[in-house]
Amino acid sequence: MTKTVLLYIATAVAAILGCYLPYCYVKRDGSLLLIPAALSLIAFVGLLVLYPAASGRVYAAYGGVYILTAFLWLRFIDGIKLSPPGLSGRGGGIVRGRDHDRRLAPRRGLRGAESGVDLAGFACGCPTRRSH
């Protein structure tokens, strides 16, 4: 159990760092930051392979750890003070699932299978086309 939690934390930190360093590169013109950013994203992918099982429960648990890690990153790395109203705002609605109707709603007039879009791809933000 402890190994799995540490794996989730390491994966979350690698993912956040892999996105944060390119942000710093763009905002602060630090060209050397792209190398550790690439290494961090490679580590992120490598850590995902180590997960004990590819099931919904595993990824849901990782998602919770990722969100907690992101809040800790905001507080201690970005220096943003977190308050209860801030934690229960838009992000809190997504965490509690209240936002699912807006995020997963089909686009105008398209209904899942009729549109030729595989809705399973929406979980990663990359819908795929089915061949007919």
Curated annotation (Swiss-Prot):
GO cellular component, one term: plasma membrane
Entry keyword Membrane: yes
UniProt superkingdom: Bacteria
Transmembrane segments: 5-25, 32-52, 60-80
Membrane topology summary: Multi-pass membrane protein
Manganese as UniProt keyword: no
Keywords: Cell inner membrane, Cell membrane, Membrane, Transmembrane, Transmembrane helix
Compartments it resides in: Cell inner membrane
InterPro entries according to UniProt: UPF0060
Family: Belongs to the UPF0060 family.
PANTHER family found in the cross-reference section: UPF0060 MEMBRANE PROTEIN YNFA (PTHR36116:SF1)
Protein name, entry field: UPF0060 membrane protein SG1469
